[in-house]
């Protein structure tokens, strides 16, 4: 049995709202090992902000403020990118905050992950196994859905080697002992989202 991280999802999902500075502070107070936040670019001013959903996001916290808080508290962040074409701006802000070695980048597609790694090799990046297939695949029905998941989970070790990612993030219902073995065989970590009950967490830890 290996090491397990407790990662606060979207800061820490309470009545304080998702992806807020107050949530980050609460996660720090509760002793989380890491904090996951969602990152987008705000339309009005181009600022990188903490937000899961599309929209104006005028009141969303700035990423730079979250980075400053995390650096002061000495806690790492998992930045889950919710759109593409953020690489250069993201790397610049991480360097300015001196957080390049204290973050893990997930989401946004493996192409963006590879480009971030090219721009700044010190940043760790993750390969996200999708929960759903694309709309055009969905139209082909259940059989293709099964095949799609097999492609991703059947030989994920080869995908890791091809993309040079440090870890895999996967929806907890897709996790199997075989998948865990393949990820570890590739020298990578497996991160699971988002189990919310003790029984599911215990089952995953036992793998």
What is each of the regions a protein language model found here?
Residues 1-207:
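Phosphate-group recognition and catalysis centered on beta-loop-alpha active-site segments
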């Amino acid at each position: 049995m290996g090491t397990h991280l407790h990662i606060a999802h979207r800061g820490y999902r309470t009545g304080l709202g998702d992806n807020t500075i107050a949530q980050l502070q609460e996660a720090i107070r509760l002793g989380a090992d890491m904090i996951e936040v969602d990152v987008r670019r705000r339309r009005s001013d181009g600022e990188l902000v903490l937000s899961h959903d599309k929209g104006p996001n005028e009141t969303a916290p700035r990423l730079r403020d979250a980075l400053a808080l995390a650096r002061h508290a000495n806690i790492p962040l998992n930045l889950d990118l919710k759109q593409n074409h953020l690489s250069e701006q993201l790397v610049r802000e991480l360097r300015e905050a001196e957080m390049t070695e204290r973050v893990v980048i997930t989401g946004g597609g493996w192409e963006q992950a590879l480009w971030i790694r090219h721009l700044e090799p010190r940043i760790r990046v993750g390969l996200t196994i999708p929960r759903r297939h694309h709309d055009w695949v969905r139209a082909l029905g259940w059989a293709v859905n099964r095949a799609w998941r097999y492609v991703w989970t059947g030989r994920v070790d080869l995908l890791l080697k091809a993309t040079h990612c440090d870890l895999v993030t996967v929806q907890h219902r897709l996790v199997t002992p075989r998948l865990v073995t393949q990820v570890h065989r590739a020298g990578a970590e497996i991160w699971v989202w988002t189990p919310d009950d003790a029984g599911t967490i215990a089952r995953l830890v036992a793998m």
